[in-house]
Amino acid sequence: MTSEPIIPMNYIDTHTHIYSEEFDDDRTEVVERALKAGAQHLLLPNIDEASIQPMLALCEAYPDLCRPMMGLHPTELPADPWPLLNKMEGLLTAPNAPYIAVGEVGIDLYWDDSRRDEQICVFKHQAEWALRFGLPLMVHSRAAHRELVDTLLPFKDDITGIFHCFGGSDEEAHELLQTFPGFVLGIGGVVTFKKSKLPAVLRAIVPLERIVVETDAPYLTPTPYRGTRNEPSYVPLVIAKLAEVYERPIEEVEEILLQNTHRIFQYI
């Protein structure tokens, strides 16, 4: 693996899971590297019941840096998801609730589509939270583009959010951006992969003003660190690639990405 120095930039990692056990041995150092690389905020989507406490603990340890979300990931549905969903709704409605979005929520049929209808129902229920509580959605979608669009269609003019880790086709990008004007695409390490088709899709279809950056750490590490654990300090590598894709100065890309992020999360 060929490494390269991280050039500090001003950025917000809109999707990172550094509260997970993969970071238990060096979480403090990971945060320090993120700050050194220029991170202004690290936004933390929840996954399931077990992730709530470590996520909130990290936000308490770094209240100016880390901001939590609340939601149930589609691949983590319990046999009966409704007691947990009721608990999560209670957390969202508690006095002084710290949550900046409903997430990570969505539909994932890549490995298993046996609970397709239940995933759709749970996703719709959580989209209704976003509408009721005035929060953006952090959306996970894998092998479920049509189901995603159909489920969100009734909300298209009323909620905002991020289609996290977008890696779809020209047609899918166009449909998402045209159908959901309040949403942006979350772009991470995949855009740096040698054989990725994402740069061409972005260049052809997606205005820079409809993008935010993310890591999805510990996953989807950008080149040249691909194959190792991802972390928020690698976001500048993604920004540099986007500057190349859009043929714009890095400083301009930094500023536009920050503006896009603040447009979705207006209270950061």
PLM regions: where:
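Mid-domain alpha/beta scaffold segments of enzyme catalytic cores
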Residues: 2-268
